[in-house]
Curated annotation (Swiss-Prot):
Changing residue 43 to A: Decreases DNA-binding. It holds the Pfam family Alba. Gene3D superfamilies: Alba-like domain (3.30.110.20). Transmembrane segments: none annotated. Keywords: Chromosome, Cytoplasm, DNA condensation, DNA-binding. InterPro entries: Alba-like_dom_sf (IPR036882), DNA/RNA-bd_Alba (IPR013795), DNA/RNA-bd_Alba-like (IPR002775). The keyword Transferase does not apply. This is DNA/RNA-binding protein Alba 2.
Amino acid sequence: MACEGAPEVRIGRKPVMNYVLAILTTLMEQGTNQVVVKARGRNINRAVDAVEIVRKRFAKNIEIKDIKIDSQEIEVQTPEGQTRTRRVSSIEICLEKAGESA
């Protein structure tokens, strides 16, 4: 991936603007040119929303350098005690300040 070793922002269930602030803080205050936004399952749409808000409203010099998608098979227990296999999708979005390659 293009963002090897870059700081990560993991997306969860909090409001989108919390993650927008986390992405901006990571890019502006930690002295890094790149950040990786990661999400799994139902939080993928929240990750995409956060990245687009950062790019279109706050920091127009941010570019999407790479996007990696994947899915994993996870075994879960049902309430009846049976084991089921579920697929969980994941996404990693690498962001970089334009013109400042690492």
